[in-house]
Amino acid sequence: MNRIEQQFKKSPAYVAYLTAGDGGLERSLESLLALAKGGVNILEVGVPFSDPVADGPVIQEASIRALAQGTTLHDVLTLITSFRQHSEIPIILFTYFNPLLAAGDKIYQQMKSAGVDGCLVVDLPVEEAAPHLTACKTAKIAPILLISPSTTQERLKKINEHGEGMLYYVCRPGTTGVRATLPENFPAKMNQIKSMTSLPIVTGFGIANRKMAAQALQYADGFVIGSLFVKAIAEGISKNALTRLAQSLNPHYPNLRLITPFRKKTF
């Protein structure tokens, strides 16, 4: 049983995403530790990529900045290795397929050695993922697979067969980014999916406040907040304020005044 599975046995998942290398690797390490201190219990560490088609403007711009500073996949693994000196909470590598392909076959064992627990390849459909799935399982890394509102029952069966650790439900079409509410069809879709899988389901793409997170947890086993944290980091939020922001978004944390870290609204 890996750390992802252990986490779901303890409590619902509060998942936070950040783009590695945005602001420098030292800043990324500081931010990961601040999020963990703020109650996040699974971290998604994004590998910067030049064509992040699944991401909205906030994360696209973070990738551009990280790449401009020379951040590579191997730098991201070094970051995770450093984080592992301080924390054992689960880490999912969030990446596009090209960086893995360019790194070669040894990258999966290097990921495992760095302390990666799961790998989510956002642009790799399950129908084309056999080599990746095999490499993950050989290295004892959970392949985290995506499902969406348009996923058919037949395809969901295949995803359920090959996924491990959890499934990631993209609750709306389009790209990542902050939204005001969950989609109206969210409860029905979640109930349909949960009737077909025993894997925990986390949901993301748009969750940006405590109320939405609480609503998500009525049906899902966890929620993901990404763009809000990426934007806060880009705006220069301090590590202590980032911890308080993470706490203020957690439905299971004592009610806090929502921290507003932005100098201006750009959503």
UniProtKB/Swiss-Prot annotation:
InterPro entries: Aldolase_TIM, RibuloseP-bd_barrel, Trp_synthase_alpha_AS, Trp_synthase_suA. The active site is at E44 (proton acceptor), D55 (proton acceptor). GO terms for biological process: L-tryptophan biosynthetic process. Its EC number is 4.2.1.20. PANTHER family: TRYPTOPHAN SYNTHASE ALPHA CHAIN, CHLOROPLASTIC (PTHR43406:SF1), TRYPTOPHAN SYNTHASE, ALPHA CHAIN (PTHR43406). Belongs to the TrpA family. This is Tryptophan synthase alpha chain. It comes from Coxiella burnetii (strain RSA 493 / Nine Mile phase I). The lineage of its organism: Bacteria, Pseudomonadati, Pseudomonadota, Gammaproteobacteria, Legionellales. The gene is trpA.
